[in-house]
Amino acid sequence: MALTLQIILVVASLLMTVFVLLHKGKGGGLSSLFGGGVQSNLSGSTVVEKNLDRVTILVAVIWIVCIVALNLIQTYS
């Protein structure tokens, strides 16, 4: 059980990193470093941004649940 949660935690961490980097930059952040500042004016549907926000929040919730579950398993085993 703990091994499965650890694997899910690693995958969720990687996915969350990718999803956060995919967000449009609102300033001089990391996304504008890779050319996101130029593309943000040319493309970007609000539906895509909302879906990306939802997926990012879902992955963050999965990440938090895995951390809490692993802590509980470690505490009570």
UniProtKB/Swiss-Prot annotation:
Among InterPro entries, the record links this protein to: SecG
Q: What are the recorded GO MF terms, alphabetically?
A: protein-transporting ATPase activity
Q: Which Pfam families match?
A: SecG (PF03840)
Q: Does the keyword Transferase apply?
A: no
TM segment ranges: 2-22, 55-75
- Compartments where located: Cell membrane
The GO biological-process annotations, alphabetized, read as: intracellular protein transmembrane transport; protein secretion; protein transport by the Sec complex
Any one cellular-component term (Gene Ontology): plasma membrane
Tell me what topology the record assigns in the membrane.
Multi-pass membrane protein
The answer to whether UniProt assigns keyword Protein transport to this entry is: yes
Q: Which UniProt keywords apply?
A: Cell membrane, Membrane, Protein transport, Translocation, Transmembrane, Transmembrane helix, Transport
What role is this protein assigned? Involved in protein export. Participates in an early event of protein translocation.
Give the family this protein belongs to, as stated in its UniProt record.
Belongs to the SecG family.
Write down the PANTHER family for this protein, in alphabetical order.
Answer: PROTEIN-EXPORT MEMBRANE PROTEIN SECG
Protein name, entry field: Protein-export membrane protein SecG
> Origin organism of this chain?
Corynebacterium glutamicum (strain ATCC 13032 / DSM 20300 / JCM 1318 / BCRC 11384 / CCUG 27702 / LMG 3730 / NBRC 12168 / NCIMB 10025 / NRRL B-2784 / 534)
